[in-house]
């Protein structure tokens, strides 16, 4: 299935290259864009399909939205492979919300974790990687926006009912963890 999709994406990218008289770099960008789109589409189907199966769709959505609202500005660690990304996504966005709902976790524990994650976002965002470098002129704005969004979500989490408050806090915790320098070996903040 994967190889069939790769061949189809390659054919679409080549067709667009020929039709629009694009150079090799433009072709590679189109191909990468299509690969990312379809990979994310299939990953979304798998994650939300499992969320429906486990009856945690709204919980998964809540964690996902808080996570991605911050990640858009904070960036962060990526899985090493597509397969690892699927596994991590299932664990982070389906299994962890399910556990959070099923296990009675003290509210103060989640608040402390979210506060620590907020500090990590303040210290380390935006997390710059070799594959996703951030130009110098954008770093300060992204950092400020990531801190602002994380702060707003943390404050909002105090005013919404359980379990959604803890799910928003879980999203903050996950993106805070994705900022940790341990995920970026042999890299400096300069990229």
From Swiss-Prot:
Top-rank lineage group of the source organism: Bacteria
Gene Ontology CC entries for this record: plasma membrane
Catalytic activity, EC: 3.4.-.-
A single GO BP: proteolysis
InterPro entries, per the entry: AgrB
Predominant cellular place of this UniProt entry's protein: membrane
Top class in the EC scheme: hydrolase
Entries under SMART domains matching the protein: AgrB
GO molecular function: peptidase activity
Keywords tagged on the record: Cell membrane, Hydrolase, Membrane, Protease, Quorum sensing, Transmembrane, Transmembrane helix, Virulence
Subcellular location: Cell membrane
Membrane topology: Multi-pass membrane protein
TM helices/strands, residue ranges: 45-65, 81-101, 108-128, 144-164, 165-185
Any matching Pfam family: AgrB
Similarity annotation: Belongs to the AgrB family.
Functional summary from the UniProt entry: Essential for the production of a quorum sensing system signal molecule, the autoinducing peptide (AIP). This quorum sensing system is responsible for the regulation of the expression of virulence factor genes. Involved in the proteolytic processing of AgrD, the precursor of AIP.
Protein name: Accessory gene regulator protein B
Organism: Staphylococcus carnosus (strain TM300)
């Amino acid at each position: 299935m994967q190889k069939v999709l790769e061949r189809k994406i390659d054919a679409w990218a080549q067709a667009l290259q020929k039709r629009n008289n694009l150079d090799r770099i433009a072709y590679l960008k189109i191909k990468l864009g299509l690969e990312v789109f379809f990979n994310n589409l299939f990953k979304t189907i798998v994650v939300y399909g499992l969320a429906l199966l486990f009856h945690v769709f709204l919980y998964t959505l809540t964690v996902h939205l808080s996570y991605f609202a911050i990640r858009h500005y904070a960036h962060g660690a990526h899985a090493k492979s597509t397969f690892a990304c699927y596994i991590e996504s299932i664990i982070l966005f389906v299994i962890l919300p399910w556990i959070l709902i099923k296990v009675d976790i003290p509210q103060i524990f989640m608040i402390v974790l979210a506060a620590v994650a907020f500090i990590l976002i303040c210290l380390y965002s935006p997390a710059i990687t070799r594959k996703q470098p951030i130009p110098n002129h954008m770093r300060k704005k992204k950092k400020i926006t990531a801190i602002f969004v994380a702060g707003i979500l943390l404050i909002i989490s105090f005013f919404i009912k359980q379990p959604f408050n803890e799910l928003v806090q879980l999203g903050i915790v996950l993106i805070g963890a994705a900022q940790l320098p341990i995920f970026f070996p042999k890299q400096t903040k300069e990229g």
